[in-house]
């Protein structure tokens, strides 16, 4: 994986090999208006009361105050700000009108399975419990520790549950050249933080049989629950043979969930940024400043990993991820009960089981500490961030990236940098790419104003029906900050 400083001559970001092939398969028009369909999900989703105890207090870094002097860091002529789109993106070709697709019969079956709280042991936990429609299909089933709570008391998954919106675009796990000048291939894609599943159907099975998640003992147990469900007849009609054997039931369950999770409902492209790309909305000056900092390699350099194309009027070209892997050295989440064991680490990609027939091995120690780069779409709606859920505020995430190298004491209070990676693998952590390549006590690449601007820009990636909620939250925050 290329981790050296990029050339200061600004050129378009190379498209990974998988993306070139995938782009040909994208539909020319993607349904945008999702509100009415999501309301069905929002209304049907069961809610779970937060757990009474978290097993320890959460580490929540305070709002950073980076010295104003940091904004005076010298910038060479070669580090000039990369030009970004104007306030209104040009329309290259006609944009089809938005429509609201009704879920098909097959998609409705998948939705019913997704919401079914009887599919866990003991009952009470559904897919939607950890991938809550109310928080852009992310969340942790009421857990206060940053990782998903399982169906059994005291049991927790290893990681923060990611959003399952836009999963239709995630390619299967594979190795490819990340940049045109690379010699060695790097890992891309796969569902989950470590790419354990190649398809949504395969991904959907994982929590069902995890003892710390939905805790089913066998396919026969799940098949019995499906046969007794209120949607059993619909499942059998839409997926013939689904109830005949446990294996057939599991196959149908995976297919039904895949049909639902890859529907247009789950990839709506209804954010303000999407309207901006279509030429139907303007970004505010603060949001434009954030977009500029997001792209500028002398500032955030976020676009290198969270790829987007502000000059394209097609939102589906801006998924805000390359689906590559990176080791960023996030702080250890000490609110996770299992982390009380100092020898317990989540090694990420290198723990992934190698599948037969694949020439390159993801278990190579150089990938220890690496996790798949998530999409930033709807990131402002999420309640937990990073694979271990250590951050609860989006602003802290941006500040971490900006100051991890320059002010490590803000993030690693116990002295050791990269304290959630074993000593022997800490050299894997990315210290070469912008903005990680600054020395300790150097001025950070981003000052407070830059961080606020990037957060404002990231809020424009919020789809309906979440947009109004983000706007209300921002207004509430502004009101509190101006009140004497």
Predicted features, each with a name:
Residues 1-26:
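N-terminal secretory signal peptides that target proteins for export/translocation
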Residues 2-3, 45-484:
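Periplasmic c-type cytochrome electron-transfer domains
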Residues 7, 23, 28-29, 36, ...:
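Serine residues within intrinsically disordered or low-complexity segments
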Residues 8, 15-17, 33, 56-60, ...:
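Intrinsically disordered low-complexity regions specifically enriched for long asparagine
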Residues 31-43:
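Bacterial N-terminal signal peptides
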